[in-house]
């Protein structure tokens, strides 16, 4: 409902004439239908023309081949030549007419679509990066989102909650949305990671040899044999993957660490196999709880159903685990994990390290978490309305159920952090390196990549200079160049000999390139900064931050 109301508000502010746009869109849709029909006719006429002329050519070849020896066949060939030529010639003006009509329709569609874009321009200008999160804040008042991920927010995670930046090693942030729940910080992150994988390459070699064999008459003769030999080698290659996660800081249960993964039990209640599986998991937990030979202090709780589903057997502080997961928390967590009607069920990995909580959700990984307003731009008012509502409702659902495991724990909602004593150390407007990497990725990996790079690039940043709310950021793109290599593998051939089969492969060697990016988080950048940004071929205003790529 809020998304619909917000769209109506934006429409009213924009002054867009919705009736005129609907009428124009109806004309465009009608023209698109006519263009589709004309395109189909053009294709059919073209195919029939080709059939006619190709058939005539084939008949001509047949007539020449008979050379008058078969009068009946030659007569049929002549008939085919005439029929093919008549068909092709008759269709030429029809094809030309429909092609001309199609071109005219396409020109009309382009002109009217441009007019429709101009009609919608006042509305398209009103979309902002925070329009989606403002709707969530209005729906859930205890949630507050930051305009961008500040250094202040990151410092709070470091100093108050013990967050470690080692997580970011070898990763590049694509998008980050920070905020707080009841004063406790959280960050949604979308990042690019690289890991070494393997690729199998194939090579081949043709061989031949001579053999003697007896024919049906018992005579010996020489025959030539041929065989293709294949060989394979497996070599390392960089594999890139994008992931999304949620980081949350809370002082509750500060000495407790645990991890759990999706149980695989969602949607399997009531079946025999499900009952057997749950019973087996519970028996394993009971055996683990009774084992006194290891260093674990794991003690099974009375709620066996919760233990079976949540399955956090690596917890290291039983008292704080019970303090965190009260009977109410257990019930709410079970409801969350079982529900696939409204929510996504048990699709989340939950890792708690002292005061830091990290969650990975399958649905979040498939979701869109960036709020780029350009995605709402449209020339069709009704289509824009439908997409705006659908996107924002889906965004709310994805974000809410990513946060739901945290919201299911009452103690997390009761704990509010003390006033952040570090909030003035770096200044509230300074953006964090997460935001710098996201900005660089927004400009595009290709803008920073090494010229020899043939893979994706991991973009890492550092602040070179900061003065008066304006910063120079060094962006280093880490990628790999490819060097062609050849291995020779010995393969046994049908000739009874070993052959060296060449297998070409690519060796990936690291390359990097550093470029400068300038940015200003201030609402009103200096005139000099704005002039330089305007002069740059690559500038962007994103989430209250104006940035441009400096020439080198």
Residue ranges and their predicted role:
Residues 460, 468, 472, 476, ...:
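Long C-terminal extensions of eukaryotic subunits of large macromolecular complexes
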Residues 156-437, 442-446, 450-487:
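Structured extramembrane domains adjacent to transmembrane segments
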Residues 21-24, 93-204, 536, 545, ...:
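N-terminal topogenic membrane-targeting module
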Residues 56, 63, 134-137, 141, ...:
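Short alpha-helical interface elements
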Residues 79-82, 86, 116, 396-404, ...:
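Generic detector of bulky aromatic hydrophobic side chains
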Residues 27, 69, 257-260:
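N-terminal targeting/docking segments
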Residues 1-43, 541-545:
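Cytosolic juxtamembrane N-terminal segments of multi-pass membrane proteins
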């Amino acid at each position: 409902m809020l998304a619909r109301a917000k769209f109506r508000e934006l429409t009213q502010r924009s002054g867009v004439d919705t009736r005129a746009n609907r009428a124009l869109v109806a004309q465009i849709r009608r023209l698109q239908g006519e263009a589709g029909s004309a395109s189909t006719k053009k294709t059919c006429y073209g195919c029939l023309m080709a059939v006619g002329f190709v058939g005539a050519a084939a008949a001509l070849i047949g007539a020449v081949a008979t050379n008058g020896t078969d009068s009946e066949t030659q007569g049929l060939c002549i008939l085919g030549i005439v029929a093919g030529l008549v068909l092709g010639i008759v269709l030429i003006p029809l094809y030309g007419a429909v092609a001309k009509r199609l071109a005219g329709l396409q020109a009309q569609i382009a002109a009217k679509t441009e007019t429709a874009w101009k009609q919608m321009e006042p509305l398209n200008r009103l979309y902002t990066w925070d329009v989606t999160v403002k709707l969530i804040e209005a729906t859930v008042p205890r949630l507050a989102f930051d305009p961008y991920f500040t250094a202040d927010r990151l410092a709070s995670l470091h100093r108050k909650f013990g967050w470690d930046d080692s997580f970011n090693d070898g990763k590049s942030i694509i998008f980050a949305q920070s905020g707080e729940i009841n004063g406790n910080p959280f960050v949604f992150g979308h990042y690019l990671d690289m890991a070494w994988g393997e690729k199998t390459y194939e090579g081949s070699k043709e061989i031949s040899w001579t053999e003697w064999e007896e024919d049906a008459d018992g005579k010996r003769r020489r025959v030539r044999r041929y065989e293709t030999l294949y060989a394979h080698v497996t070599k390392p290659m960089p594999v890139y993957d994008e992931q999304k996660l949620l980081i949350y800081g809370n002082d509750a249960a500060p000495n407790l660490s645990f991890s759990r993964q999706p149980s695989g039990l969602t949607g399997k209640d009531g079946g025999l196999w499900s009952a057997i599986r749950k019973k087996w998991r519970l028996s394993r937990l009971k055996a683990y709880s009774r084992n006194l030979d290891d260093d674990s202090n794991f003690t099974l709780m009375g709620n066996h159903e919760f233990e079976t589903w949540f399955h956090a057997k690596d917890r290291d502080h039983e008292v704080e685990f019970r303090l965190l997961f009260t009977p109410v928390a257990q019930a709410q967590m079970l409801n969350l994990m079982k529900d696939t009607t409204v929510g996504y069920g048990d699709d989340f990995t939950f890792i708690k390290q002292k005061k830091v909580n990290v969650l990975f959700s399958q649905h979040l990984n498939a979701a869109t978490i960036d709020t780029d307003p350009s995605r709402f731009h449209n020339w069709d008012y009704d289509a824009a309305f439908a997409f705006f509502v659908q996107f924002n409702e889906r965004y709310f659902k994805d974000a809410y159920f990513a946060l739901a495991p945290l919201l299911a724990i009452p103690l997390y909602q009761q704990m509010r952090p003390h006033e952040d004593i570090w909030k003035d150390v770096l200044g509230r407007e300074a953006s964090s390196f997460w935001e710098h990497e996201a900005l660089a990725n927004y400009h595009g990996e290709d803008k920073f990549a090494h010229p020899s790079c043939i893979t994706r690039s991991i973009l890492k940043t550092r602040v070179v200079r900061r003065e008066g709310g304006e910063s120079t950021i060094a962006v280093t793109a880490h990628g790999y160049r490819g060097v062609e290599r050849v291995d020779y593998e010995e393969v046994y051939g049908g000739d009874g000999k070993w052959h060296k089969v060449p297998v070409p492969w690519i060796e990936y060697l690291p390359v990097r390139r550093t470029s400068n990016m300038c940015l200003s988080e201030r609402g009103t950048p200096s005139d000099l900064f704005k002039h330089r940004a305007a002069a740059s071929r690559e500038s962007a205003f994103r989430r209250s931050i104006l940035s441009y790529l400096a020439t080198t």
